[in-house]
Amino acid sequence: MTVKKLENSSDVNVVTEEVKILTNLLNESTEQLIGKELFTKIQNLIKISADKNYQELEDQIASLDNREMIVVARYFATLPLLINISEDVELASKVNVLNNTNQDYLGKLNDTIDIVAQKKNAKEILEKVNVVPVLTAHPTQVQRKTVLELTDKIHKLLRNYREVKNGIITRVEWTEELRACIEILMQTDIIRSHKLKVSNEITNVLTYYPKSLIPAITKFTARYKELAKKHGLDIPDATPITMGMWIGGDRDGNPYVTADTLKLSATLQGQVIFEYYIKQINQLYRSISLSTSYMKPSTEVMHLSELSNDDSPFRTNEPYRRAFYYIESRLVRSEQKLLNITNQHSFLKERDLEHLDQIPAYEDAQEFKADLEVIKRSLEENRDQAVVKSYFTEILEAIDVFGFHLATIDMRQDSSVNEACVAELLKSAEICDHYSELSEKEKVSLLLNELNNDPRNLHTNNKPKSELLQKELKIYKTARDLKDRLGEDLIKQHIISHTESVSDMLEQAIMLKEYDLLDNQSARVQVVPLFETVEDLNNARDIIKEYLNLDIVKKWLVSQHNYQEVMLGYSDSNKDGGYLASCWNLYKAQKDLTAIGEELGIKITYMHGRGGTVGRGGGPSYEAITAQPFNSINDRIRMTEQGEIIQNKYGNKDAAYYNLEMLVSATVDRIASKQIVSEEYIADFRSSMDKIVTESNEIYKKLVFENPNFLDYFLQATPIKEISNLNIGSRPASRKKLSDFSSLRAIPWVFSWSQSRVMFPGWYGVGSAFKHFIDADKKNLQELQHMYQGWPFFHALLSNADMVLSKSNMEIAKQYAELCQDEKTKSVFDIIYQEWKLTKQIILQIEGHDDLLSDAPNLKNSLASRMPYFNILNYIQLEMIKRDREDEIKGVFQSIIPITINGVASGLRNSG
């Protein structure tokens, strides 16, 4: 049976029709706004770009003045955005059609559960699976919230296109609505005029919950349980998807994340879910108008209705409505009490608002659920099964998934900050005056003694404290208070960036101990190491083994159901060692850590710190998960979802449902599937990969760390400086100076290479390493081909590199190299170009393909259709960078470069 692969797939014919309509409307709106003369220039640029006459394209763009340039840039930044919307709509439509007609596609939940149901431990697998997308605000989402709201409207209109074609919806009215959206879009500021605050990032991300995530997750969870039940597998407590959040708790390198932002994040999350519940209960109140004249409610329902203040004479015979009114009142009171806010709700009568403090708040979400279960049981006793299924299924699932907290907030801090704080605490408590000078063994011994034997909170003495320590302590106090109010699931882990030792983990424990988030018996918050660099990944095995063997850690793990989470950093390991070294060392680290967990009877679970690009661990979701080492996914997996990827995956409920289905199906597949190839076969592959990766790492380091011109090339031949000035995130682009490579954040590093169309982090060093391996023995090419065909990890490795190469453009990259100030710096491009050609050649040779993207024809067609448009954006960007670096651009024209960055990011889709 051939299974359709839908990621990066859409109905080409329908998309072509829609794009033609969108392009015509954009053209008409643009010509109307700017006049025929300038619009003719735009059309001429498209023709030149389609003909690949790049020199003439460069000349024509150089002839435009700044006033013309801003309009032209807006036009070409808008078109890829519209194409994206059309493709997203058609993908969702295709999924719905295939589901409704019982056809198969890769990752379809029905098929996955059908396969798993044959396993002896099927119930255990399906009951325990938990996939957690963790939303972050890393600076790659360059679109404003206002623009996203406009694109949502266009998305909704395009969803109706088939009805328009069939005459169900009037074409003229539909077209005019679409035209109005495009006219507004063309005259709306695409780029923010001010840098985002953390509070803005929180509110922006939370908008995805009511419009897509909550409805998609509740629908998916209900469907998941229903499909399992068809196989006789009753899993009422399963939560295949829960959500995570970094914004407000991730303070690593972001001085603007404080105790206040943590509290704000928790409060706003609570508001979102309470508003959802209140809206749903209000809908139940309005809909379930059953009268005692025709049915007999349970005694429990009558009790709830009697507690209600709804004394309307029209409700006398409607106990369900009165019960819902009471539940709704309790929810409003709970929101006020638990979140410390006062919200007015129009459904409550003014008299009830005055006496709201007399209504008991729910202690937790399960108490709220219990009231709904009372009503559900009563309806079932009256055989109102359709009412129960239609009105109760999804809200009850929502309570189990979201509670009163919505999403689990991760806390994160750099290990160096923890060390500084612990050193200060130990000194102020007169325990140790020179902690940082101790050896690793001495540090561990001292910290264990404190954790095991010293019940004190070290900060409680009256000695003055540094600003840093005060800030950190306040965050831990806030975390404890929030957990006490909103439940244990609100904050469950604290991640340590740059974990290099056991003492780094124990220092984190000391900080948690200061506000009783752990003690010598149990832990309310888990210490989670983040291994980022290649060196740290190689050391992870020894660090984790020593840590897990500590007696106090064993006690903590008992309180956490014997799970230990480890976070793996894709971005920094790539920047540190290159694409192959990063992927391979992450793979090996997982195998090693999983083996340690099995040896000690502890489930090691992984948090994957992925970004949108291949250079940051991105790529198609299904393949990314099924390419993980066998046995590395026990039942829980978490992964970051960053920047523009959040909009792409979760921008609407159809896309959200499909992408969540891919994540869960892939996870279940990886847990349930047997080893495709033997361990001995993989052992041979591992030996070969070790050799290849060593070579690749040397090639990468020779250029990045040993070539004296490389850093200057990066700073001059990419828009890194311009990206650093963008108002696209609260976090600085670099921890120190931009010219300090070690402190440069991985995200702007990758984003800059994407903009210059080199896509360097996703492929550099691959070609030479493989060629060296092939040249060493003529049989090695055949081995690589076998690896590609039979090893999911290696297949995904090459497929992702293939995709990255297809999005690169060396002709454009060469023009960015011309920005370099001297020939020595410019010569770095020649090294990059030679490696690019070799990598493309070798990858195609191993894959057995003639062209890139041979296995992804839909993506290939998509890129081909948009390339002529967003290639022009690169040339506009280049010209404006030249002008700005020669004589700083001022005023409204400062927005031109950011507009082009926005457009290129939209065109590439996974750019940061």
UniProtKB/Swiss-Prot annotation:
Bilayer-crossing residues are: none
In which domain of life is the source organism classified? Bacteria
- GO cellular component terms attached to this protein's record: cytosol
Q: Needs which cofactor? A: Mg(2+)
Q: Which GO terms describe its molecular function?
A: magnesium ion binding; phosphoenolpyruvate carboxylase activity
The yes or no answer to whether the keyword Protein biosynthesis is present is no
Q: Which keywords belong to this entry? A: Carbon dioxide fixation, Lyase, Magnesium
Keyword DNA damage assigned to the entry: answer is no
Q: Name one GO biological process term.
A: carbon fixation
Query: What does the record give as the active site?
Result: 138, 575
**Regions annotated as coiled coil:** none
- Catalytic activity line of the entry: oxaloacetate + phosphate = phosphoenolpyruvate + hydrogencarbonate
Q: What is its EC number?
A: 4.1.1.31
Which EC class does it fall in?
A: lyase
**InterPro entries attached here?**
PEP_COase, PEP_COase_bac/pln-type, PEP_COase_Lys_AS, PEPCASE_His_AS, Pyrv/PenolPyrv_kinase-like_dom
Concerning Gene3D superfamilies, the annotation shows: Phosphoenolpyruvate/pyruvate domain (1.20.1440.90)
- What this chain does, per the record? Forms oxaloacetate, a four-carbon dicarboxylic acid source for the tricarboxylic acid cycle.
Concerning its family, UniProt says: Belongs to the PEPCase type 1 family.
> By what name is this protein known?
Phosphoenolpyruvate carboxylase
Q: Which species expresses this protein natively?
A: Lactobacillus helveticus (strain DPC 4571)
